Amino acid sequence: MRNTLIPILVAICLFITGVAILNIQLWYSAKAEYLAGARYAANNINHILEEASQATQTAVNIAGKECNLEEQYQLGTEAALKPHLRTIIILKQGIVWCTSLPGNRVLLSRIPVFPDSNLLLAPAIDTVNRLPILLYQNQFADTRILVTISDQHIRGALNVPLKGVRYVLRVADDIIGPTGDVMTLNGHYPYTEKVHSTKYHFTIIFNPPPLFSFYRLIDKGFGILIFILLIACAAAFLLDRYFNKSATPEEILRRAINNGEIVPFYQPVVNGREGTLRGVEVLARWKQPHGGYISPAAFIPLAEKSGLIVPLTQSLMNQVARQMNAIASKLPEGFHIGINFSASHIISPTFVDECLNFRDSFTRRDLNLVLEVTEREPLNVDESLVQRLNILHENGFVIALDDFGTGYSGLSYLHDLHIDYIKIDHSFVGRVNADPESTRILDCVLDLARKLSISIVAEGVETKEQLDYLNQNYITFQQGYYFYKPVTYIDLVKIILSKPKVKVVVE
């Protein structure tokens, strides 16, 4: 489990680090863009005020003359030829003397008083048409020249084509943005960044880009994000390959058990005469992540040698109970479910409790749970062992001796333990052919079982000759490729649904 998590954690850390670095770079880039945009807006305002400054020079020349129709026409022409100017007003001793509008009209409801600056933002309430304006002032002795600039031109100058930023013009303590009226800050400064004009008394203020922006990452760095993700996945893949290569077979098997890669296969047990389904033997298979299965012959000996056979069997028990409960209503009464148990598992302190919990996890109580004792390891038969198996037998478990005759002390087990079934190994059944000599050993085994009143299950039935021999000798329970090979749970469900439910009677 640890070796599985490390590549994943490394990949996550690499991806997060890469995203963090990319985000910082994009943030600095966005800050530079915002600053460049503010300078661009300031430059736009400078150009507008440059027009206003030039217009005041013309107005000064007119102020030295008479304010007649010709002079008003000249003022109007000056205002019209300057694309960003609205009106020009000449004041003498604080009184409107001449304007660029006919009849010396002004669009101000009152003449404002300028602070210590030549710029002033007038709110909509101070204008006739209720639109805010920017005023530029130039003072010559007792003559004041006022130039008004429409809010549309100011907003246009502030409208820099950058997403996510709002530029605001600040004059003294008043501000105007791309929308809305003139506002007074009154000591409250919601904007943290600013660019000062080097020519006029105004400032472009704005807020910096957010430190983290998912939209910015996708919009500006999508390609790099994909590259970072590929690098992180490649690192995880290489680490996983490294750990798998350097891990011992035992560690690899332990990881497979923890990851649920050891799954149950089911080989049906049938009535050899009728072909009816009587039960299943649970067999372990190692499911590969990329498809395919590994035979138990490749990993069961390692599991027994390393002690992993116990957690492996526990995992199978949990899976079998869950799967059988899902189709419990489809199983015939007395259906056999057999699981192999090694000697090391049987002598473990928790074995009896595990088996009882296994039984209690089934929703049906009329199933025959078969404990198949394997002979691959020697089993030390003592009083404690006999007591354990007797407890399980009394609680409804059926005890079977698997692969009889191929392992350790099979005959002594028959003498010392309460055995309900012996399962004749396929190596004996496989010898059966037309030659009478081929069945001598098997005949002896069958005769022994009958004398001890022990039922028999024949494994490895593959030919019609073997089937006929077993039926002639009244061996009811049979399993092998002649009937069914070991199948997945899904295939077992299909088999069960295709067969009528028949009560299983022990014969």
From Swiss-Prot:
Induction: Induced by 0.3 M NaCl in an RpoS-dependent fashion. The chain crosses the membrane at residues 4-24, 217-237. The keyword Membrane applies. Gene3D superfamilies: EAL domain. GO terms for cellular component: plasma membrane. The keyword Hydrolase applies. It is an enzyme of class 3 (hydrolase). It catalyses: 3',3'-c-di-GMP + H2O = 5'-phosphoguanylyl(3'->5')guanosine + H(+). One of its GO terms (molecular function) is cyclic-guanylate-specific phosphodiesterase activity. Keywords: c-di-GMP, Cell membrane, Hydrolase, Membrane, Transmembrane, Transmembrane helix. Its EC number is 3.1.4.52. PANTHER family: CYCLIC DI-GMP PHOSPHODIESTERASE PDEB-RELATED, CYCLIC DI-GMP PHOSPHODIESTERASE PDEF. This is Probable cyclic di-GMP phosphodiesterase PdeG. It comes from Escherichia coli (strain K12).
